[in-house]
Amino acid sequence: MAKTSMKAREAKRAKLVAKFATKRTELKAIIVDMNASEEARWDAVLQLQQLPRDSSPSRQRNRCNITGRPHGFLRKFGLSRIKVREHAMKGEIPGLKKASW
C-alpha cells in the first residue's frame, strides 16, 4: 500500500490541475499563436512559468484507487493489475472473466 501522504499529494495535484487548467490553455494558445506579437508571447511564457509546478497535468501519476500503487495501473478499471485480478476472481467486475483458449 502506498503511503497516505502520497495519495494526498496526488489529490492535491489533481485539484491544482483542475484549478489552473483554463489559465494554462489560454497561455499556451498565446504562445503557439504566430499572429501574436513577440512581446505578448514572451509574457505568456513568463506567466506560464509563474504557475505552480504541480498544476501541470504531466506531473500527475495514475494510482490504484484501493492501494495507491503507481505501477501496473489499468485505466479501464482505475485499479492496479493485482486488485483487478483479485476482484475478477471474486466475480466483482461485471463482464470480466479469466481468459481460456
Curated annotation (Swiss-Prot):
GO cellular component: cytoplasm; small ribosomal subunit
Gene Ontology MF, one: rRNA binding
UniProt key word Transmembrane helix: no
Coiled-coil segments: none
GO biological process, one term: translation
Source organism superkingdom: Bacteria
One of the Pfam families matching this protein, by short name: Ribosomal_S14
Keywords: Ribonucleoprotein, Ribosomal protein, RNA-binding, rRNA-binding
Family: Belongs to the universal ribosomal protein uS14 family.
Subunit structure comment from the entry: Part of the 30S ribosomal subunit. Contacts proteins S3 and S10.
Known function: Binds 16S rRNA, required for the assembly of 30S particles and may also be responsible for determining the conformation of the 16S rRNA at the A site.
Name of the protein this chain belongs to: Small ribosomal subunit protein uS14
Record lineage: Bacteria, Pseudomonadati, Pseudomonadota, Gammaproteobacteria, Aeromonadales
Designated gene of the protein: rpsN
